[in-house]
């Protein structure tokens, strides 16, 4: 049963004298929705064919390469778990809610960009939007910031699975990005919020809903968006989004920055996704352009160089050579593959990276030992091929397991 304060607030704010749509909203907000997936560029045809053979029905959506997933009548979910298919395990698609895919689609204008941008994803876990950014901006470098250490493992797992050598992970409080004054060409701020739009997942986000809590969350969001706008270059663009539906966390935040900065910024687009209208989770997003410089009232601080152990690595790999656009770095005994490294190189001394590019193996006794995913960043000559029998063996291998197999 929905919280009465929640119901009263939304009826008064959005559905006054509109009982019919209010009831539709209440009847829809908790209903489960069909899954959607985002297929990696260049993999669309083969992934669709394999999933359709497995009994899935893929219905296109308004976002390129995003499909709504339904099942044939003879479908057996115990035999065909979407998350255990080969294409999911190797990162050919990502399971992502449709509304949650819209912010990156908005930031990229729905197309793949070939410009070289430095991009900040301010609150990136679990990684759906970060991996989407890596696909839409393949020639850019993305800083995936996650302020909560507990959420880093899930982010790291998804970044590794989806292959993102043009991404680094940082662990800064969102407000700290104001110290990186006008550094980023694009910023995505998917802000922490009340989560009112996630009830379709079975969450209890509105169980203890109270306007006082909403105001507290909105105060944090104001600090985060000020930090983001300070870090954004003049002429740069950012998208602000939440999975909340109340006006304090959405339209109220836009009103706050419009009053604070006036003509220095411009909100060029905003949209709220209502479950009973858009058949998605509840969501809000807005696109903002920075027109003039913003000087924050808090002076920049000098941040310590935490990356002294990250160095370029130039030793030969024997039968291995780098794919185009990849630069090797070493961190202790680990070997890293970094795409578009020249974009982020000037900032290696300015911010601490928990992860830089992809780890592709380690160096020991003057020899390189690749890991299970190194093939994505290396050209490999004269190697033996091993046949895996099923998805379980593939999953075990990709997690670092050792398999005993006959060579082809």
Give the role of each language-model region.
Residues 114-115, 176-190:
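A short acidic, Gly/Pro-enriched loop at the edge of an enzyme's catalytic core
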Residues 147-182:
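S-adenosyl-L-methionine
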Residues 1-54, 291-408:
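Polybasic, low-complexity RNA-engagement segments
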Residues 126-138:
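Conserved SAM-binding loop of SAM-dependent methyltransferases across substrates and taxa
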Residues 184, 237-240, 244-337, 342-343:
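Class I S-adenosyl-L-methionine
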Residues 232-234:
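Helix-to-beta-strand junctions that scaffold the AdoMet/dcAdoMet cofactor pocket
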Residues 150, 186-227, 243-250:
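Mobile active-site "lid"/loop adjacent to the S-adenosyl-L-methionine
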Residues 114-123:
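Conserved class I S-adenosyl-L-methionine
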């Amino acid at each position: 049963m929905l919280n009465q304060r929640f119901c009263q607030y939304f009826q008064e704010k959005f559905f006054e004298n509109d009982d019919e749509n209010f009831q539709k909203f209440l009847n829809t907000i908790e209903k489960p929705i069909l899954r959607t997936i985002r297929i990696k560029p260049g993999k669309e045809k083969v992934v669709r064919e394999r999933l359709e053979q497995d009994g899935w029905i893929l219905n296109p959506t308004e976002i390129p390469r995003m499909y709504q997933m339904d099942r044939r009548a003879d479908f057996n979910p115990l035999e065909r778990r979407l998350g255990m298919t080969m294409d999911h395990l190797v990162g050919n698609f990502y399971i992502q809610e449709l509304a949650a895919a819209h912010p990156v689609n908005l930031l990229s204008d729905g197309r793949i960009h070939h410009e070289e941008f430095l991009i900040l994803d301010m609150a990136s876990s679990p990684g759906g939007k970060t991996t989407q950014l890596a696909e839409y901006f393949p020639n850019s470098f993305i800083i995936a910031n996650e302020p909560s250490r507990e959420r880093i493992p899930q982010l790291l797992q998804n970044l590794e699975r989806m292959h993102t050598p043009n991404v680094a992970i940082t662990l800064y409080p969102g407000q700290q990005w104001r110290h990186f004054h006008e550094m980023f060409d694009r910023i995505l701020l998917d802000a922490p919020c009340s989560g009112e739009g996630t009830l379709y997942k079975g969450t209890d986000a509105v169980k203890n809903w109270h306007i006082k809590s909403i105001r507290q969350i909105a105060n944090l969001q104001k600090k985060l968006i000020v930090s983001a706008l300070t870090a954004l270059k003049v002429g740069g663009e950012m998208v602000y989004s939440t999975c909340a539906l109340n006006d304090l966390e959405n339209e109220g935040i836009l009103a706050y920055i419009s009053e604070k900065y006036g003509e220095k910024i411009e909100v060029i687009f905003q949209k709220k996704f209502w479950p009973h209208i858009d058949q998605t989770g509840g969501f809000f997003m807005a696109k903002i352009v920075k027109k003039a410089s913003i000087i924050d009232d808090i002076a920049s601080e000098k941040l310590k160089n935490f990356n002294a152990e990250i160095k370029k690595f130039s030793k030969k790999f024997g039968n291995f050579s780098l794919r185009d656009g990849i630069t090797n770095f070493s961190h202790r005994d680990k070997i890293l593959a970094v795409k578009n490294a020249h974009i982020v190189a000037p900032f290696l001394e300015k911010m601490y990276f928990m992860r830089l590019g992809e780890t592709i193996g380690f160096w020991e006794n003057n020899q390189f030992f690749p890991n299970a995913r190194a093939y994505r960043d290396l050209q490999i000559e004269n190697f033996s091929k091993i046949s895996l029998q099923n998805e379980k063996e593939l999953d075990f291998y990709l997690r670092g397991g050792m398999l005993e197999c006959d060579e082809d």
